[in-house]
Amino acid sequence: MELTSEQQSVLDGRDGPELADCMKTLVRMGDAFSAPRLVPIVSAHLTGSFKIASFKGYYELLQRIVNAGLKVSVPTTLNPHPGYEYAPQNRVIFRGQKMHEQLLEALGVTPNYSCVCYQYHNIPQFGDILAWAESSAVIYANSVIGARTNRHALLADICQAILGLTPEFGFLLDENRGAQVRVHLDVQTMDAPALGFLLGQKCMDRTPLLDHYPFSQAELKNLGGAMAASGGVTMFHVLGLTPEAPDEETALRGQAPQETLTITQRNLDALRADHGVQKNTAMVAIGCPQMTLE
């Protein structure tokens, strides 16, 4: 990967070992994905918003970075955190949480604690390059907003937030944003979460193009969140609705789809029947993305 003279100086340790380690992480990631260079980002979103013992390496790096006086160089938001003030078990499992949050805030991170950062605090524009690490936010940014981000991992996300840079590969490139699976909808009563769950299973890490449907913002959020959870989908298109799918040829980037699927009402109903809440269920936990008043 080709670095600028400034980036090379950081890598060589001019600004201290902590910043050099951050640059080394991005260079290794870029080399792994054959990225030709590092490019500036508009914002970052972190997943490391909670402290448990298994993420020891991440916390040690975070402490070193704070001790060195480094701060994030772009607007940076955070995923949800545990409700340690309410649950006794959380006060044990996440006993270092308050100190962890103090470190993050010392870095200049916005303490929003939400995976729907794109609704407030961290709202990108079409074409913005991001370094986000929450899968449900990543798919929404790519698909609904038309911003560009890969799905980043813990530790790499904080390095990108500090340097304000990301390796140029994957969904940052035009050639990787085209649809690969054409999805026809034969549905009378739309169930966006069920549809997303099915498509995640069927598409895995491929990008689907759906027939036109007037999804609401909440439905698009839940559609994408379910795809990212049941599969590895990072982007989807809805014909005539999402910004990079004004027509079929544009969404497919002029290529024939690898596969064509038809999702029917029976498919959605069967999924609900198989995965529905049973009568003797004592508790239901709802995860990301968070619900709204709508």
Task: Set out the residue ranges of the language-model regions.
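Non-transmembrane, aqueous-exposed alpha-helical and coiled segments at domain scale
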Residues: 1-294
